[in-house]
Amino acid sequence: MKPSSLLLFTTTILLCLSMAQPRATRKGVTPKQGYCPEFLLDCPFVLLPVCSRDKGCKGTKKCCFYYCQMRCVEPWTTLT
């Protein structure tokens, strides 16, 4: 294997491994308490997101996929 090919291969593997880590571990951010509410209906389309992660939501709200959109919602305390 050529040195340039080996470098490309190694870089690709390292990039894949770093992306496979959970976000909370990578960025040192812990998710807010609670669980996202279940949304079991099929979405014919997905709306533009209002949030991308929990820290973008005020108070105790979590960023969850709900009603065909990523939005800030009150979390469930238990899974039902």
From Swiss-Prot:
Q: Name one GO cellular component term.
A: extracellular region
Please report any disulfide bonds recorded for this protein chain, giving both cysteine positions: C36-C64, C43-C68, C51-C63, C57-C72
Q: Which InterPro entries does the record match to this protein? A: Elafin-like_sf, WAP_dom
Q: Which Gene3D superfamilies is this protein grouped with?
A: Elafin-like
Q: Which residues form a coiled coil?
A: none
One Pfam family matching this protein:
WAP
An example of a Gene Ontology BP annotation on this entry? defense response to bacterium
The residue ranges of the WAP domain are 29-76
Reply yes or no: does the keyword Signal apply. yes
According to UniProt, the name of this protein is WAP four-disulfide core domain protein 15A
Which organism is this protein's natural source?
Mus musculus
